[in-house]
């Protein structure tokens, strides 16, 4: 163990980076940053049947997108199997573990008997003190920890408080399977020790594992890292977060147009509080984060709150950064965006940047931002949505023709000059500005909602604006 803080994020690569896993990574990252320490990344790929390269890629991509960088190389648990076996053999040599030759049928009978009698200890220790010379030759033995049978195993958890287990209720857990492969329980303890992990911060669904892992630490004479078991994330209805509540993977939130800074900010407040403060910069998070302010109760995921928070981050984002995020997110949304991506060039990027102050005021996600920027990329003649189609009546199409003539006389094109021309036209024809602006919006954007009409004219420029009006005008 070192004096400096070392945390670790240790996901299993059996699927995407879950939103709960992302919060665990965030808490580990924040704690390490606050204390000038390191966060290590360990991929717990001992389950060879379920672990996939695609899942590993999704985890690494998710962490990079969330800007939760790790220190050093990624550690792959399976690659350390020889070291795990070495520790099991050492415990065996020291008399702190033993070979168990129980057959699958015997183990099943033990479990059924224990459950029928209401006992949590499922293995009866039949090979704990038996002479190995009596072992059957046709059974490949497991190696089990010789766990204490009396007294208590105690964890002083930084979140859960003092947690106590009666040793009489805990099994002699398996360290090595019959095929020689280490178990998850052993691998975690050995890796945490060898990596110099000082603080284990993980979901409270691992709390029962802590008792078993402490017994391995004690048997090896190793110091136990500080333990913090944080509450799980539940859905809005209070049940465990599942697919029926909506998206689960970080990649899905990326595709839905959430900003990494907004998702980090939202996740940090799930289970942790700092007074009434809701908005945190990364620097503020690092400075304020502490484990003592993490509650024990499960946090509820509120999608509306996340969306509102994301809207805040979009409104306060730098316009140039939003253009880049706009472009980046196109790689992660449905294929229908490919056509839009093909139209990104210096001209449309400049138009997008010019429109961004207006676009970002209305958008809560990057997807909404994309939708509201549609008018920039639309091909002539515009495809009108049903509401715009209904608005462009024969009379309003005649009005569009008159507006085309009025705007054609604007020499220096800008939002201000086109506004002056339209206001003058409305006044001369005894029309309210809204009666002019709405048909104009439909003709210019194909929709009935958009940024301010003068901003639209400014962004599209003289030639494109007049061309679109001519397409929809009726002489």
From Swiss-Prot:
A motif ('HIGH' region) lies at residues 11-21. Gene3D superfamilies: 1.10.10.350, HUPs (3.40.50.620). The keyword Membrane does not apply. Its EC number is 6.1.1.17. SUPFAM superfamilies: An anticodon-binding domain of class I aminoacyl-tRNA synthetases, Nucleotidylyl transferase. GO terms for molecular function: ATP binding; glutamate-tRNA ligase activity; tRNA binding; zinc ion binding. Belongs to the class-I aminoacyl-tRNA synthetase family. Glutamate--tRNA ligase type 1 subfamily. HAMAP family: Glu_tRNA_synth_type1. This is Glutamate--tRNA ligase. The gene is gltX.
């Amino acid at each position: 163990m070192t004096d400096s803080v070392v945390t670790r994020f240790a996901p299993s690569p059996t699927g995407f980076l879950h939103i709960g896993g992302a919060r665990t990574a965030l808490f580990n990252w924040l704690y390490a940053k606050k204390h000038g320490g390191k966060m290590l990344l360990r991929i717990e790929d001992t389950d060879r049947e379920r672990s996939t390269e695609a899942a590993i890629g999704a985890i690494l991509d998710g962490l990079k997108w969330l800007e939760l960088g790790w220190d050093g190389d990624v550690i792959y648990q399976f690659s350390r199997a020889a070291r795990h076996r070495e520790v099991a053999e050492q415990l065996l040599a020291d008399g702190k573990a033993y070979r168990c030759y129980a057959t699958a049928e015997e183990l099943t009978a033990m479990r059924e008997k224990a459950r029928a009698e209401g006992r949590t200890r499922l293995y009866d220790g039949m090979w704990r003190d038996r002479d190995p010379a009596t072992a059957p030759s046709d059974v490949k033995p497991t190696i089990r920890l010789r766990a204490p049978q009396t007294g208590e195993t105690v964890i002083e958890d930084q979140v859960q408080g003092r947690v106590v287990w009666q040793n009489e209720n805990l099994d002699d857990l398996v360290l090595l399977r019959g095929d020689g492969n280490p178990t998850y329980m052993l691998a975690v303890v050995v890796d945490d020790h060898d990596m110099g992990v000082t603080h284990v911060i993980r979901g409270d669904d691992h709390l029962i594992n802590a008792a078993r892992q402490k017994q391995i630490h004690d048997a090896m004479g190793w110091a136990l890292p500080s333990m913090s078991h944080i509450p799980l994330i539940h859905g809005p209805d209070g049940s465990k977060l599942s697919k029926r509540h909506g998206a689960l993977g970080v990649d899905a939130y990326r595709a839905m147009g959430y900003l990494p800074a907004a998702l980090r900010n939202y996740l940090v407040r799930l289970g942790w509080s700092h007074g009434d403060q809701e908005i945190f910069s990364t620097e503020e998070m690092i400075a304020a984060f502490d484990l003592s302010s993490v509650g024990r109760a499960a946090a509820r995921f509120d999608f509306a709150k996340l969306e509102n928070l994301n809207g805040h981050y979009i409104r306060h984002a730098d316009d140039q950064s939003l253009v880049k995020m706009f472009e980046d997110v196109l790689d992660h949304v449905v294929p229908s965006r490919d056509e839009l991506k093909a139209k990104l060039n210096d001209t449309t990027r400049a138009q997008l940047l010019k429109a961004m102050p207006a676009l970002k005021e209305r958008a809560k996600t990057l997807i909404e931002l994309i939708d509201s920027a549609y008018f920039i990329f639309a091909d002539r003649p515009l495809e009108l949505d049903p509401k715009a189609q209904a608005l462009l009546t024969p009379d309003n199409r005649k009005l569009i023709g008159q507006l085309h003539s009025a705007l054609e006389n604007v020499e220096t094109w800008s939002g201000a000059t086109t506004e002056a021309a339209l206001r003058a036209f409305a006044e001369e024809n005894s029309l309210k500005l809204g009666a002019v602006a709405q048909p104009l919006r439909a003709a210019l954007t194909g929709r009935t909602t958009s940024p301010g009409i003068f901003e639209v004219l400014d962004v599209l420029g003289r030639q494109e604006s007049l061309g679109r009006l001519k397409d929809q005008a009726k002489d």
